[in-house]
Design a protein with these regions (language model features):
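Conserved phosphate-binding/catalytic region of the ribokinase-like
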Residues: 1-116
Length: 116
């Protein structure tokens, strides 16, 4: 549906806070739930999501998004990055490190059915 409406876009990411994230990357579409975390402040969560997404793209390359499994992993990483940002006060100070995101996801690997 997203690809049909925006057929000139390489991809679309739609975040909706605690309702999760929808994505269309290459020919891969999906919806991921949000992570259940104790929320302190939501400022910067969207920026953090984008930072996590771009971080994964810089490691894997944009062409990797053509693989459905990798596309889901990249969006999962971005979702985790945004979620972790909400667990601390402040927009900048709350930004997690790559190691913090990876540790967070490792603890949820079975729950997600994926690894990053």
């Amino acid at each position: 549906a997203i690809a049909y409406r925006l057929n000139t876009a390489e991809g679309v990411l739609i975040t909706d806070g605690d309702k999760g994230c929808s994505y269309c990357l290459s020919e891969n579409e999906g919806k991921l739930p949000s992570f259940s975390v104790p929320v302190v402040e939501t400022t910067g969560a969207g920026d953090s999501f984008v930072a996590g997404f771009v971080h994964q793209l810089s490691k894997l390359g944009i062409h990797s998004l053509a693989d459905a499994k990798i596309a889901k992993q990249v969006v999962t990483y971005a979702t985790a990055t945004g979620a972790l940002t909400t667990t601390k006060p402040g927009a900048i100070a709350a930004q997690p490190t790559a190691a913090e995101v990876e540790a967070f996801l490792e603890g949820r690997g079975e729950e997600l059915g994926t690894t990053v």
